[in-house]
UniProtKB/Swiss-Prot annotation:
This is Ribonuclease T. It comes from Xanthomonas campestris pv. campestris (strain ATCC 33913 / DSM 3586 / NCPPB 528 / LMG 568 / P 25). Mg(2+) 1 binds at D31. The lineage of its organism: Bacteria, Pseudomonadati, Pseudomonadota, Gammaproteobacteria, Lysobacterales. One of its GO terms (biological process) is DNA replication proofreading. Mg(2+) 2 binds at D31, E33, H189, D194. The active site is at H189 (proton donor/acceptor).
């Protein structure tokens, strides 16, 4: 399914503009692939972002994906077991990895554009185990001294919680399947694939949820 098509065509839960639906925050799905679990010690290796869009009928759908491979930041570690899980080959000739600052610039630009498009104040990170992604993102932002981070520094929407409530599943693959979405295990643990699947899952849940009649 193309990423710019609505996931669900149920009756709209809300006709509030995006700028009011989530208190001025634009949901943006993020997934990172890393060299381990410690954001202060392990390298950020991949990042992907998908802004959540809204059509004229009030349905949420995934926007365009922005992604980057990253050159491991100097002084950070990479656990070989993490590379086994993700399948990342650091010296692959077609990896085209960017330095951290350039990678953040690349993925932040379309996020800021989407925030502006919908008249929102800032982006809020949506992720599966979202604080893992946010902690690695914030660590990279701090390392390079990035001044234009569009994301809220600590608030998130976590699809682990949402999927647990909606489907009784907390593992991304099982939650996606419970939501009626396709899942390809061979593509999992790619930042792009996991982000796009998480975006579809978020939209599926958000479109089915009875949204507020008004919001501040």
């Amino acid at each position: 399914m193309p990423m710019n098509e609505p996931v669900d065509l149920q009756p709209s839960p809300s006709l509030l503009p995006m700028s009011r639906r989530f208190r001025g925050y634009l949901p943006v799905v993020v997934d990172v692939e890393t060299g381990g679990f410690d954001w202060n010690k392990h390298a950020l290796l991949e990042i992907a972002c998908v802004p959540i869009e809204m059509d004229a009928q009030g349905h949420f759908f995934p926007g365009e994906t922005a992604s980057a491979h990253l050159v491991p930041a100097p002084g950070l570690e990479i656990d070989p077991k993490s590379l086994e899980i993700t399948g990342i080959v650091l010296d692959h000739p077609f990896r085209f990895a960017k330095q951290e600052k350039d990678a953040l610039d690349h993925v932040f630009a379309p996020v800021r554009a989407a925030v502006k498009k919908y008249g929102c104040q800032r982006a809020i990170l949506v992720g599966h185990n979202a604080h893992f992604d946010l902690n690695f993102l914030n660590a990279a932002v701090a390392r390079v001294g990035h001044k234009r981070n569009p994301f809220h520094p600590f608030s998130v929407f976590d699809t682990v919680t949402l999927a647990g409530v909606a489907y009784g599943q907390t593992v991304l693959a099982r939650a996606a399947q419970a939501a009626g979405l396709d899942w390809n295990s061979a593509d999992a643990h790619s930042a792009v694939y996991d982000t796009e699947q998480t975006a579809r899952l978020f939209c599926k849940i958000a479109n089915a949820w009875p949204g507020p009649a008004s919001a501040g």
